C-alpha cells in the first residue's frame, strides 16, 4: 500500500512540473498533500499529525485558490496528450519493474528483526497514548488553552471587521 502511495506521489510530482494552469497546479498540490498525510498517518500509526497537517495545507490552499481565481479566472484549461502519455508510461514502467524485481531483496529488508523490534505496534501505540496525554496534562494544557483562546479571539475580530464593512474586506471595482 505504501509503495502504491509513493508511486502516485511520484507521478503527481512529475505531472506538477508539466502543468501550466494555476488551478490544475493547485489540484496537484492538494493531491500531493493528501498522499503525504496518508503516508504520515501510516508511519505514526495514528492520524493526529497527518490530520493537522492536511488541515493546515488545506487552509493555505484555499487562500491560494482565492488569489488565483481572482487573477486568472477566464484562462482556458486544456488537457495535454503528452502529459497523459508520460503518466501512462511511468505507471507501465513501474508495473514491469515490480514484476522483474528480485523479491528476496525486499524480503531481506522487511524481515529484519531489528526493524521489527523498532516498529512494533505495542511500543508505537503506547508512545502515541503518552504523547496525547502530554498535550492535555498540566504543563502543556496551558499552551493548549492559550491556543484555543487565541483562535477564538481571532474569529471574533474577523467577524467584527467583516460585519462593520457589511461585505468582503477587499473593495470591488
Curated annotation (Swiss-Prot):
This is NADH-ubiquinone oxidoreductase chain 6. Its EC number is 7.1.1.2. GO terms for molecular function: NADH dehydrogenase (ubiquinone) activity. PANTHER family: NADH UBIQUINONE OXIDOREDUCTASE SUBUNIT ND6, NADH-UBIQUINONE OXIDOREDUCTASE CHAIN 6. The keyword Mitochondrion applies. Belongs to the complex I subunit 6 family. Core subunit of the mitochondrial membrane respiratory chain NADH dehydrogenase (Complex I) that is believed to belong to the minimal assembly required for catalysis. Complex I functions in the transfer of electrons from NADH to the respiratory chain. The immediate electron acceptor for the enzyme is believed to be ubiquinone.
